[in-house]
Structures are given as structure tokens and as C-alpha cells.
Amino acid sequence: QKFNPPAMKEKIGEKTKIVVICNPNNPTGTYVPIGELEAFADTLPEDVLLVMDEAYMEFATEPDCCSMVDYMKAHPENPILVLRTFSKYYAMAGLRVGYALGSEELIGIMRKCSASWNLNVCAQKAAE
């Protein structure tokens, strides 16, 4: 199915706290052009966190399939979290090495919730 911003927006209610978009999508490889993503992000309520799962971004070859990192930096007032991984592109699936990009506030919240032992030494060395 194609990304449908109006239909997605219609599903966002008072109880909605997070919207997650995988771009590019796994396993189909389809993607949402950056312009559509930015326009959609502009319409989200201030209290809804947009989580962009960009695990496969390094495989994208289309010029309009771009990361939301620049948008996130340009709009610090919008709660956006971009998730990336080394596991897919660098063939490190067994090591489960990834990272999150977001505001200091969002990253601080994540740190409070994460276990301090969630990454083994082998994975840490591979990420270096």
C-alpha cells in the first residue's frame, strides 16, 4: 500500500502518543518521498512523537528518499526521533547495533528507560 497521509491523520486521536513510519519500508522497499514526509510531520499535533525507522536508508537509491534528520534539526519544536542501525547495511545483524537521533530531551528519556547493559563488548567494538 502507498503512504496515505490523510488516512493516517484520520487515525490519530486524543490517545495517540506515537506515530511510527518505516522509510524505506521493509520488506517491500517502497519509500515515502521526503516532501510527503515533511508535509505530514507539519500536520502532527505537538504532543505526538514521530518515530522514523530508517534502518534501510543506506540502501535507498532514489534522490527523493531522504532521511528526516535535516527536518528534525530544522524543527526542534517538533518531537521527532530517527532510528538508524549498523546491523543491516554493514552486515552486523547478530550484533544488533543501532542508534537514535533526537532532541536532548527525547534522548534523555530513552536513557532513563534503557538498561545499562543492553550492548555487549563485541557490538561496541564493531560500532567503533
Please place each PLM-identified region on the residue numbering.
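A structural signal for well-ordered alpha-helical scaffolds and beta->alpha junctions
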Residues: 1, 5, 65, 103, ...
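Active-site pre-lysine segment of PLP-dependent enzymes
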Residues: 2-14, 27-50, 56-89
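Walker B beta-strand of ABC/ABC-like P-loop ATPase nucleotide-binding domains
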Residues: 20, 51
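Generic recognition of cysteine residues
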Residues: 22, 65-66, 113, 122
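PLP-dependent aminotransferase class I/II
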Residues: 79-128
